[in-house]
Amino acid sequence: MVDFETAPINAPLAESDPAIARLIDQERDRQETHLELIASENFASSAVMAAQGSVLTNKYAEGLPNKRYYGGCEHVDAIEDLAIERAKELFGAAWANVQPHSGAQANFAVFLALLQPGDTIMGLDLSHGGHLTHGSPVNVSGKWFNVVQYGVDKETQRLDMEAIRQLALEHKPKLIVCGFSAYPRTIDFAAFRAIADEVGAYLLADMAHIAGLVAAGVHPSPVPHCDVVTTTTHKTLRGPRGGLILCRDAEFAKKFDKAVFPGSQGGPLEHVIAAKAVAFGEALRPAFKAYSQQVVANAQALADRLMARGIDVVSGGTDNHVVLLDLRSIGMTGKVADLLVSDVHITANKNTVPFDPESPFVTSGLRLGTAALTTRGFDADAFAEVAEVIADRLLNPEDDAIQARCLERVASLCRRFPLYAMATEPALV
């Protein structure tokens, strides 16, 4: 056997590439010792990471299961079929495509399947909690299509379905997008369906943020009401980073399959698809429902305690995992708040709030999410303590003693709720 010294295929990562191994180790330490409150992040299980870090990364498999352009696909066919069946069972869908590399790719495939350049679409304004792919002018969705953006009511900071209906009647969109990246309230998918039917529009639900809550029955499902549903597979679903498309109509299914491949992607990432299958299997277990219920209870506890400390929360609370702070109530910008909590090892992100006078690079809001820390085992009491730390830091930005105490409390919480305790990163095995 030839020994290729330049290709140490059996060497562990720490030996083969110590620089990358060291950086991965540092990132793991950061995740263990910081409080993760970014609403779009979560912690995948060791099983999910093991599947994603497997030999499946070696296999090329253009096409759909049992309709490949390459040989040797019998095992990845079985894996992808299992991922599809689990996704359908989890969300009550008639069809699923598990190949999109991301939620943005899933949305793009839907646009490619249903629309032509110049068609009119409606989506939630980014500054009101929407997403870049819902018609933002900096995204391809805002460049290819005529975009009509709807927003929330200025007083209630909630979706005004009658105002949305009037916009739809005026502009007659070909497709309406319902979904968000920073909207803390329940979405009435049935009301969106009625509007879409009235104007003859397709209805796309982007449930990327709430997919796990939908799977667990904690948030109403869009699947019975929408022509097509897209999602990411991480966030509240707690899987690998990736995308998913669901629908209930065989005619649409063929269009979406072709829009994914060959329309917008080449070979699927079968190692990621295997990890998706594992995550879907985990979400089908009874424990996942209890987890998702706790995610919402924790968000409500976080919001309540922050409001009690005098910090406004957009819409006055939350129905899901998102808590969006309106920092105008304490005379602070999101940019400053982001840096302040980061100094005490709390990870969040600045975010626009409805009718925000600040630029997207500054903002008046701070977006928080409870999915990741709930995975660590945080309960409502622990989140009330997290809220106290955040409030202490934001309300006393110049007090070094309070900053030091906040750091101590964060460290204590991290020790009480360890993440991958005593586990070995798959990449380092």
From Swiss-Prot:
Q: What does this protein do?
A: Catalyzes the reversible interconversion of serine and glycine with tetrahydrofolate (THF) serving as the one-carbon carrier. This reaction serves as the major source of one-carbon groups required for the biosynthesis of purines, thymidylate, methionine, and other important biomolecules. Also exhibits THF-independent aldolase activity toward beta-hydroxyamino acids, producing glycine and aldehydes, via a retro-aldol mechanism.
Give the pathway: One-carbon metabolism; tetrahydrofolate interconversion; Amino-acid biosynthesis; glycine biosynthesis; glycine from L-serine: step 1/1
Q: For site (Plays an important role in substrate specificity), what residue positions does UniProt give?
A: H234
* Keyword Transferase listed: yes
State the name under which the record lists this protein: Serine hydroxymethyltransferase
Class in the EC hierarchy, top level: transferase
Keywords in alphabetical order, please. Amino-acid biosynthesis, Cytoplasm, One-carbon metabolism, Pyridoxal phosphate, Transferase
**Species of provenance:** Synechococcus sp. (strain WH7803)
